[in-house]
Amino acid sequence: MANHKSALKRIRQSAKRTVANRIDKARMRTFAKKVLAAVEAGDVELAQQTLRDATSVISRTAQRGVIHTNQASRRIARLNSHVKKLAVAAAS
C-alpha cells in the first residue's frame, strides 16, 4: 500500500478512471455486437443504422483516450466491411 499522500490520490484516480473506461469499452462492444447481430439476421436497413450508432460510440471512445485511434478505425472498418458485404449480397 502506498505511503505518500500523492500516491494514495493516484490510486483513487486510477480506480475511478478504470471504472469509467470499463463502462465505455463495454458500451462500445455492445454496439458492435448489435451491428453483427443485424448482419447475421440479414437486415440491411437495421445493420446500416446500427453501424452509424456504433461508429459514433467507437469514435467517442477513442476521442476520450480509452482506446487508440487506430484501434477505433480498425473496428469501424471491420464492421463497415460486414455491412457492405450484406448490402452487396442483398442487392444481387
UniProtKB/Swiss-Prot annotation:
One of its GO terms (cellular component) is cytosol. One of its GO terms (molecular function) is structural constituent of ribosome. Keywords: Ribonucleoprotein, Ribosomal protein, RNA-binding, rRNA-binding. Transmembrane segments: none annotated. It comes from the Bacteria. InterPro entries: Ribosomal_bS20 (IPR002583), Ribosomal_bS20_sf (IPR036510). The keyword RNA-binding applies. GO terms for biological process: translation. Binds directly to 16S ribosomal RNA. Belongs to the bacterial ribosomal protein bS20 family. PANTHER family: 30S RIBOSOMAL PROTEIN S20 (PTHR33398), SMALL RIBOSOMAL SUBUNIT PROTEIN BS20C (PTHR33398:SF1). This is Small ribosomal subunit protein bS20. It comes from Magnetococcus marinus (strain ATCC BAA-1437 / JCM 17883 / MC-1). The gene is rpsT.
